[in-house]
Every structure is written in C-alpha cells, then in structure tokens.
Amino acid sequence: MNIRSFLLISIFTAISYLVVDGATPRTFAPSASVSINYGTLSTVFPSLYRRASTSSSSSSSSISTSHDSQPSTSSSSPSSTSTSSSSGTSVITASDVSASNEIISSSTNNSIHQQVSVVTEYVTIQPTTYVTTIFQYTSLASTIAAQSGIASLVPQTYTPYGGVKALIGILVGVVVGSVFLLAIVMVIARIWGPRLLANKDQNNNNEDLDSNLVSKDSEGTPQITYASNF
C-alpha cells in the first residue's frame, strides 16, 4: 500500500466519520425544528421535541356538629341555613332549635386545593428510510426523562425527506462511496497489477520458446517427396 492509497483511505474515513456522526441520534435543544401538521410530527434530522402535561387534584372536607342546651323558654322551633362561597371554598352552616331548646348546629366545609404538577417529556424524533443505507436510523423515538424519572419508547409518525440538508447528505454519501470504491480498485491494481503482468510476460516467453524449439526440430528432418511416372 503506497502513500497515495493511505491518504485516500484516511480522507474517506474522516469524511465518513463526520457524515455518520452528524447523522447519529443525539440530544438537541428543545428549539430544534419539528413541524406538526394535523398531529403528525415531521422532521429531517433527529430533533428534540418537548411536550408538557399537567395533572393534579386534591380535596379535603370537614364536618362538625355542636350541641348547646338552653333553658326552655319557648316551644317554637325556628331553623336557619346560610351558605357562603369564595375562591373555590364552599361553607354550609345549618342550625335548628329543638323542642327542648337544644340548639343543634352543623357545618360542612368543602375546600378544593389545586396543586399543579408539570411533567415535561423530551421526545427525540428520528427520521428513517433514506435512499442510501449510510443514513439508516431507528424507527422509534425515545422519550428522554426530564425530571419525571420516566423513560419509555414512543412510536411517532414522520416524513424522512423535505430538506436541502438531506439532499446534500445523500450527495456526499454517493461521492464518498465512489472515492472509497476507487481507492479499493487502486490498491488492488497496485498490489496485483505487477504480478499479473509478470505472469503474462512469462507465459508469452514460454510460448515463444516452445515455438522456436518446434521450428528447430523441423529444420533437421529430411524432406521426403514421392514421385511417380505415368
């Protein structure tokens, strides 16, 4: 292997590393270009898509009952009910006076406290089905855990084409592949070419030697002619 072939292979390796390393899945910023059309995620290169979901609910209730006995002064039984509500809290209070003037009051307090918890998921969208196999990716998009501690695989729907970078990548792949094939042919020709030429020259020399020997043998043989008289 000469210096030229070594340089060609080194250049090809470097270009291939840059191309493939630029195409491998990695963590991008949340501002990566991901277009959403009718609920379908579309991207050309691996992109990071951020989605957030909120969920919370908590409630508390309390019931209290009090009894107060008073001397009997009247036989009437009045009753009263009051209701008040403000900022998500409802308080219902009811009181009743029994025949024995024993005041029975009960109150119910229902309070709803909203506790909002935000879970942020980063979904890596990866394209697939490129023309050349150099740019083959996986067909699943992995959900990267942010602070939720959850990691799973979420299949997504996307389109693999639609950008100038993809076409440039395909052209670079074709050029790099052609250079690689040319380097292989040059190395094979450099190594095996002289041997093949030497074998061919040796075969030609052997054929010439055989033909010379046959001609010399025929020169020493007397020629016999037949004559007849009619």
UniProtKB/Swiss-Prot annotation:
In the UniProt record, the signal sequence range is 1-22
The organism's superkingdom is given as Eukaryota
Membrane topology label: Single-pass membrane protein
Give the Lumenal membrane side ranges. 23-167
Its keywords, alphabetically, are: Endoplasmic reticulum, Membrane, Signal, Transmembrane, Transmembrane helix
Where does the sequence pass through the membrane?
A: 168-188
Which cysteines share a disulfide bond?
Answer: none
- In residue numbers, the region (Disordered) covers 55-90, 208-230
Give a Gene Ontology cellular component term annotated to this protein: endoplasmic reticulum
- Asked whether the UniProt record includes RNA-binding among its keywords, one would answer no
Cytoplasmic compartment ranges equal: 189-230
Localization, per the record, is: Endoplasmic reticulum membrane
Protein name from the UniProt record: Uncharacterized protein C16G5.06
